[in-house]
Amino acid sequence: MLTDMDISRRAPLKDIAVLGAEFGLLPDEMQLFGKTKAKVDLRVQQRLAEQQQGKLIIVTAVTPTPHGEGKTVTTIGLTQSLKALGNKVCACIRQPSMGPVFGVKGGAAGGGYAQVVPMQELNLHLTGDIHAVSNAHNLGAAAIASRLYHETRLGKAEFELQSGQNYLDIAPNGIRWHRVVDHNDRCLREIEVGLGENNGPAYTSGFDITAASELMAILALSRNLADMRARIGKLVLAVNRQGAAISAEDLGVAGAMTAIMADAVKPTLMQTLNGAPCLIHAGPFANIAHGNSSVIADDIALKLADFVVTEGGFGSDMGFEKFCNIKARQSGLTPSAAVLVTTLKALKANSGLTSDADINAPDQARLEAGFANLNWHINNVARYGIPVVVAINRFATDTDAELNWLIEAVAGTAAFGCELSEAFSQGEAGALALAQTVMRACEQPSEFTLLYPDDMALEAKLSTLAEVGYGAAGVSLSEAAKLQLQELSALGYADLPVCMAKTPLSISHDPQLKGVPQGFIVPVRELVLNAGAGFITALVGNVMTMPGLGLVPGYLKIDIGADGEITGLG
């Protein structure tokens, strides 16, 4: 079989202006970037404000493993198959961060014959949205550091006299706003800034990956440009000596930060291998942020398509949970059905049983033990009140006997249906049965339900997420988290939803606990207010907001020839 890159290169692409017109966009609603991609102007939201919405489908997965479950492959494959069945359909996915592209995970365009193309353009830069987020974020960091410098240098009276601005009285070590970069770079996790003569005062800070920036979450959750501007104004950059928050609005930098992101607020239109439209927008990670593409992209797609297929990062305890309790809660755009992706390899890897056998080899004992993980995720999705269809992403090494056993086992669960998907090897033809079952699921009566109400106490939300969302015995808060809990409640932020930042490699907080862990306590070490994004992040265990590169990073495979052709992506 051809490589992903070769398939992408050989694909007969439709001119993006033609594809956009067929999708329902007007010429002045598209800002073209060559013939392969276009920004979608938000004026289309106003034109289609009264348009009836299509059906929203959210794709999620079992607990991820190093073998790859094929969630994006299934998302794109399902989109292609829905189109092949005569439906007007659109996929909405996140823009890949270059950190994972050059790290371990690789690209995020799908794979095989279920891809967004050209895949090299999607995986590297695209239309520059992530760079805009990085620059806007770092402007905020430079602005608050500069303000601290000038206030310290001049004192209150002289500062106000010379600058004409209010003295913010920034506390020593009161700056909360890190800098960001779109790479995995562990040595930047903790740094000292302001060292040297006339550069200070010095304080401890650090870098996060851009996907972890609150600005990225704001981009993904904003309804329009005005909403994004208002949210950016609420960003908490520092605290003063009295402990009160200093916002981007207080600093006077919110307008400039928003201006940098003026084009980033527009989704990017691309296409799948069979010419289905795909809107790419925003890229928050699901382990350290809320892990879903933008509300704006969903809103536009739902007004133009019969079916919209989107995905949440990692397993259903991560991106799907945050899709429901953060994204859908804020946007009001709720799903009609969910697709839960699994593989034989994933279930064996999640079995908790050790084996020297090849993961591709038949192993009924491991498969049966790992089925508990799939059943947990089925029940987890079903508790939100929507029908769930299990998609078994078939690999060439899978045996019919094990596949048939799994299909029969799923029939005894809460799943609406179960279908094999061979979209990777067969493209649109490989997921037709899945598409038909998903269409039937979308017609079922459903009542979307949140895990907790807005007015639940903040500590109770944490407990509910841990106990109901993960099956934990409870939560434990560090002393710092206990103080932060009191502060956030006193300041009136207890009505915000919670975004758990934890490992994706287990339903629990511990990546070593496989299958369906029980009796564990979720350790919350820190609570972080994201006033602009509208949620509170609970940092759990040892999760990092700046990843590091592995021993054998992905960039080792990537090169470019004299003809300009990039190799090694995928």
Swiss-Prot record:
Keyword field: ATP-binding, Ligase, Nucleotide-binding, One-carbon metabolism
Keyword hit for Cell division: no
Signal peptide, first to last residue: none
Record pathway: One-carbon metabolism; tetrahydrofolate interconversion
PROSITE patterns linked to this entry: FTHFS_1
Tagged with keyword Ligase: yes
Cited HAMAP family: FTHFS
Family: Belongs to the formate--tetrahydrofolate ligase family.
Protein name per UniProt: Formate--tetrahydrofolate ligase
Organism in which the protein naturally occurs: Shewanella sp. (strain MR-4)
Taxonomic path: Bacteria, Pseudomonadati, Pseudomonadota, Gammaproteobacteria, Alteromonadales
